[in-house]
Amino acid sequence: MLTKAPRGTKDILPSESYKWQYIEGLIREICDVYGFKEIRTPGFEHTELFLRGVGESTDIVRKEMYTFTDKGGRSITLKPEGTSPAVRAFIEHNLYAETQPTKLYYITPVYRYERPQSGRLREHHQFGVEIFGAKSASADAEVISVAMTLLKKLGLNNLELRINSVGCPVCRKNYNKVLKEFLKNNLEYLCDDCKVRYEINPLRVLDCKVESCQRITKDAPLITDYLCDDCKSHFEELQKYLDIMGYDYIIDPRIVRGLDYYTKTAFEIISKDIGAQGTVCGGGRYDGLIEECGGPSMPGVGFGMGLERLLITLEQNGIEIPKPEGVDLFIAYVGEEAKLFTFALANKLRFNGLKVERDNMDRSLKAQMKYANKLNAKFAIVIGEEEMKENKVKLKDMRVGSEVEISIDEIEQRIKNI
């Protein structure tokens, strides 16, 4: 057990980490052009934040949170999602007092105790964006656009955007009465979880993936038929923004998401090539969450995207992430003096921005050159007593095998100019 990662976790080795770096770099580029600023929140929070924010009827709170009592007697939870901590930071640091909206993004590990399966680990990584302070449906459309832009730039084109409105507390109260009346006649056929949801938050029954529950809810009354004028207008406005951007979408009344804080907009983006497990992004609006967590009455909207699931989706679609280029220069040496000299030379060239490697294993010259090939080095030089004396080396282009003699002082500029 000592040499094995805990169940539901995974090491990201160098053979895979370049993929993460590429995606995270693209995320940062996209968020920058959209005007989102990065926020980093702690890995754990007071449990009460998630009880109030995520909602006590959710599977996350009821079954999946990693909660413990610390040495000070406080109930602490490893964060299971990114929105509530971002809201807490927004309130704690009085960001609501600044000119709005506040546009944030994060890339963070999150923790949920659930059955490990493909794309769903107990520790996984989430990319999310949040817009606080904007009630217009244009903010909803903007966060959707961020997600769609990332997915399309990664090469995922066969996407399906599904949208819904889950209403506000006023119109949802009326809908819940109608829904409970509908479900009451089939209560015995609902799964045990949905029997609890029926009492606490019946809307969540629509989100159940159990087949017997889905058979019942497929004939359930549609929440879109019970929206108040404000929610209906907001949903229509969102569709206009999506239309003007040229995004195809499907109105799906079953999209309610698995968190209690959603109001009005709820959406999912699905990779159609993958099928039922193809949801790569989900989010929506949460106009009551900031106030629920102790802040002022301010609207919010955002999404979360699991990076493990995204990487699997790319792989299943045959999309390869470009591997990083090899080192710029490998410096081989012969002799003890050259060993010290090349160490200093490598350090100088690295400081000036070149990717340089040299041998730290005291290999033979032949073995050093073999190592240079393994590193996919673009260029290589060999420095020995004669090269140090003459201040000249043969710069070998490892890609084509050609050589050119240059002074040691020319190495940096010559490589940068090629």
UniProtKB/Swiss-Prot annotation:
Its EC number is 6.1.1.21. Pfam families: HGTP_anticodon, tRNA-synt_His. Its main location: cytoplasm. One of its GO terms (molecular function) is ATP binding. One of its GO terms (biological process) is histidyl-tRNA aminoacylation. InterPro entries: aa-tRNA-synth_II, aa-tRNA-synth_II/BPL/LPL, Anticodon-bd, Anticodon-bd_dom_sf, His-tRNA-ligase, HisRS-like_core, HisRS/HisZ, HisRS_anticodon. Gene3D superfamilies: Anticodon-binding domain (3.40.50.800), Bira Bifunctional Protein, Domain 2 (3.30.930.10). One of its GO terms (cellular component) is cytoplasm. Keywords: Aminoacyl-tRNA synthetase, ATP-binding, Cytoplasm, Ligase, Nucleotide-binding, Protein biosynthesis. CDD domains: HisRS-like_core (cd00773), HisRS_anticodon (cd00859). Belongs to the class-II aminoacyl-tRNA synthetase family. HAMAP family: His_tRNA_synth (MF_00127). This is Histidine--tRNA ligase. The gene is hisS.
